[in-house]
Amino acid sequence: MEVIKITPRGYCYGVVDAMVIARNAALDPSLPRPIYILGMIVHNKHVTDAFAEEGIITLDGENRLEILEKIERGTVIFTAHGVSPEVKKRALEKGLVTIDATCPDVTKTHRLIEQKLADGYDIIYIGKKGHPEPEGAVGINPERIHLVETPDDVERLSLKNERLMVTNQTTMSQWDVADIMAKVKEKYPHVEMHKEICLATQLRQEAVAEQAKEADVTIVVGDPRSNNSNRLAQVSEEIAGTKAYRIADVTEIDINWIKNAKKVAVTAGASTPTPITKEVIDFLEQFDPNDPATWERERKVPLQKILPKVKTKKEE
């Protein structure tokens, strides 16, 4: 069986930056304890488990404001997905030390939205309902930012403002965004369009669209809550025409998916640790459908190998 290692795949710079920021916080004795992450720093349970070993507590819940109310003291880290101005304000009111690990691409979209709001625009925001990135973006001004996820949501809009802009969550399928933006343009011909798919997401989706065509099946390594991982599986099926399965790690591979495959493509979400993906690739490369001894799927990657290394200041 041939394994097609789709390139590029895995970590993006925004994820690595967020993890380094959180790791440095764990190593900084001057920061007040406990140290909390407001939601998952990135959408990968292996990463949050690794941070738990470093003494950083991940708090999750329906929304960021609700989670914040659970924190009485210490330090709070805002995740790569960004937060609303209201969350930042409330954290300061509670006297918490805050560390912002928002992805620069998300920050760029927030600034664009803020500028357009100041110029009198209403915003149509294409995003996944219940995902923290749209929560943070819509939270800038819930009265004038309108979240849509499907063309049907666009149909239900009733906006009178002549000043309209449409933009999007950075990790959406670029094909879905294009379809929904076309629907918005059809309904509101005067709308300004700002496509904000981040470059890392775009390149990974395009790689799957092209390279997965040759495969019998695609394995996407990524957490079930990772939107960009789920979109890679969607791209494989809808654009490349190749059946795809998303797995958190090697233990979730079903032998029935691969036992008759001649070519298996592998990619990984932007928040998937490289050692977790490597373990999947190693398993597939040694897999023999006729030898059950090669079918064992056990995750052996230690948690301390999950997080990126950080430079520590040498004592003088």
Curated annotation (Swiss-Prot):
Q: Where does dimethylallyl diphosphate bind?
A: H43, H81, H131, S226, N228, S271
Cofactor: binding details: Binds 1 [4Fe-4S] cluster per subunit.
Residue sites binding [4Fe-4S] cluster per the record? C12, C103, C198
- GO annotation terms (biological process): dimethylallyl diphosphate biosynthetic process; isopentenyl diphosphate biosynthetic process, methylerythritol 4-phosphate pathway; terpenoid biosynthetic process
EC number assigned by the record: 1.17.7.4
Query: Which InterPro entries does this UniProt record tie to the protein?
Result: LytB/IspH
GO molecular function annotation: 4 iron, 4 sulfur cluster binding; 4-hydroxy-3-methylbut-2-enyl diphosphate reductase activity; metal ion binding
In this chain, (2E)-4-hydroxy-3-methylbut-2-enyl diphosphate is annotated as bound at H43, H81, H131, T170, S226, N228, S271
The kind of enzyme this is, by top-level EC class, is oxidoreductase
**Which pathway does the record list?**
Isoprenoid biosynthesis; dimethylallyl diphosphate biosynthesis; dimethylallyl diphosphate from (2E)-4-hydroxy-3-methylbutenyl diphosphate: step 1/1; Isoprenoid biosynthesis; isopentenyl diphosphate biosynthesis via DXP pathway; isopentenyl diphosphate from 1-deoxy-D-xylulose 5-phosphate: step 6/6
Q: Which CDD domains match?
A: lytB_ispH (cd13944)
Q: Which UniProt keywords apply?
A: 4Fe-4S, Iron, Iron-sulfur, Isoprene biosynthesis, Metal-binding, Oxidoreductase
The catalytic activity, as recorded, is:
isopentenyl diphosphate + 2 oxidized [2Fe-2S]-[ferredoxin] + H2O = (2E)-4-hydroxy-3-methylbut-2-enyl diphosphate + 2 reduced [2Fe-2S]-[ferredoxin] + 2 H(+); dimethylallyl diphosphate + 2 oxidized [2Fe-2S]-[ferredoxin] + H2O = (2E)-4-hydroxy-3-methylbut-2-enyl diphosphate + 2 reduced [2Fe-2S]-[ferredoxin] + 2 H(+)
Catalytic residues identified in the record? E133 (proton donor)
What does this chain do? Catalyzes the conversion of 1-hydroxy-2-methyl-2-(E)-butenyl 4-diphosphate (HMBPP) into a mixture of isopentenyl diphosphate (IPP) and dimethylallyl diphosphate (DMAPP). Acts in the terminal step of the DOXP/MEP pathway for isoprenoid precursor biosynthesis.
Entry protein name: 4-hydroxy-3-methylbut-2-enyl diphosphate reductase
State the taxonomy lineage.
Bacteria, Bacillati, Bacillota, Bacilli, Bacillales
Tell me the gene name.
ispH
